[in-house]
Amino acid sequence: MSNKKIFLIFYNQLLLIFGMLCLGINVIHCSAETTRKILPYKSAMINYSKPIKFSIYLPESDDQTDKYPVLYLLHGQSQDEKIWDQMGIKEIADHLISTGCISPLVIVMPREEAYMEKISESDFGNRIINELIPYVESNFPVLTDPASRAIGGISRGALWAQKIAFNHYGTFGLLGQHSLPAAVFSDYVIYRIYADSEGKIPLMKIRIDSGTEDPYLKGALAFSKQLADVKAPYMLVIEPGGHDPEYWKEHLEDYLIWYADNLKNPAND
């Protein structure tokens, strides 16, 4: 089986399974295309009762010491992390890497279980920062420099990506806003974030895109205006399409090219 695999990781807090893993016993379920591992995880800071699930794309490598830039991609409302597989992210990434169009990268796709919950009341963003990122960086071959770490999302996932990236400005080098439904922060908050970080934290690269028929196009334009008002650099792409998987699938290759081209990769220096 190719080393290019998408792993579905289940976090849990069962001491029994943790003990098995400490003894070198893995609980693994295999299929023809993917390998799924059940692994325990417990935050050192916060004890959550519900598990986090995520899929991860790992590029093929002959050198086990290789480390790669990492991209965190967040799905939209009424979806889960399987949407990325359904849109062909593995095949697209494989093709781009194998043809030399992009450098290899790791792609992490977490599931938001309570996607109907108000973002303002959800702990999902904190769990990404406090649990998921530390776990990924401890268990997978990823670079830990913020310039080598990106976050992006589609629809509600774009809202989450913006909230996480700006609440923790300096944690990510790139932010992708794909079909952003609305501006997350007030104009003043955006102004303060950039003013407070000026000269201290490298500017985050931002790509915003939306379809011409997207009913939420105004969200992308509103965020673009906020950035323009504070003279923050960004890329705005408006192309034919709506607010749906067909639009995202059509542009998924463009997304991966942008992330890979802008993520810092010492192997390319």
For each feature predicted by the language model, list its residue ranges.
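Bacterial N-terminal signal peptides
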Residues: 12-26
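Bacterial N-terminal signal peptides that target proteins for export
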Residues: 2-15
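Non-catalytic cap/lid and distal C-terminal segments of serine-dependent acyl enzymes
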Residues: 31-269
